[in-house]
């Protein structure tokens, strides 16, 4: 699901809200979450999961084109840990790519 699809679905489910208001709410939420993570804060949404930063230490990489070794600096990357309720909800789901041909 893309951000545009999410906005469209929310607009249909909440008919009393204007599409522009839903668009603003979704974009504001994502902006606030990105801002919190960029300040090093942890975001926890009970039943869904938590977002935090994980440190990736410096390492030696390789330029795939030349094969030359390249020193890569350490960095922080976003990390999502699903909550218990979300894990239970998706435990029995089979992704469409693994289902094979739907017409069978």
Swiss-Prot record:
Q: Which SUPFAM superfamilies match?
A: IHF-like DNA-binding proteins
- Kindly state one GO CC term assigned in the UniProt record: cytosol
GO terms of biological process kind: DNA recombination; regulation of DNA-templated transcription; regulation of translation
Does the entry feature the keyword Glycoprotein, yes or no?
Answer: no
Any one GO molecular function term:
DNA binding
Keyword vocabulary terms for this entry: DNA recombination, DNA-binding, Transcription, Transcription regulation, Translation regulation
Q: Which InterPro entries match?
A: Hist_DNA-bd, Histone-like_DNA-bd_CS, IHF-like_DNA-bd_dom_sf, IHF_beta
Keyword DNA-binding listed? The answer is yes
The record's section on Pfam families has: Bac_DNA_binding
Q: Which NCBIfam families match?
A: hip, PRK00199.1
Say what the protein does: This protein is one of the two subunits of integration host factor, a specific DNA-binding protein that functions in genetic recombination as well as in transcriptional and translational control.
- Subunit (UniProt): Heterodimer of an alpha and a beta chain.
Q: Which family does it belong to?
A: Belongs to the bacterial histone-like protein family.
UniProt cross-references to PANTHER family, sorted A to Z: DNA-BINDING PROTEIN HU, INTEGRATION HOST FACTOR SUBUNIT BETA
What protein does this entry describe?
A: Integration host factor subunit beta
Q: Which gene codes for it?
A: ihfB
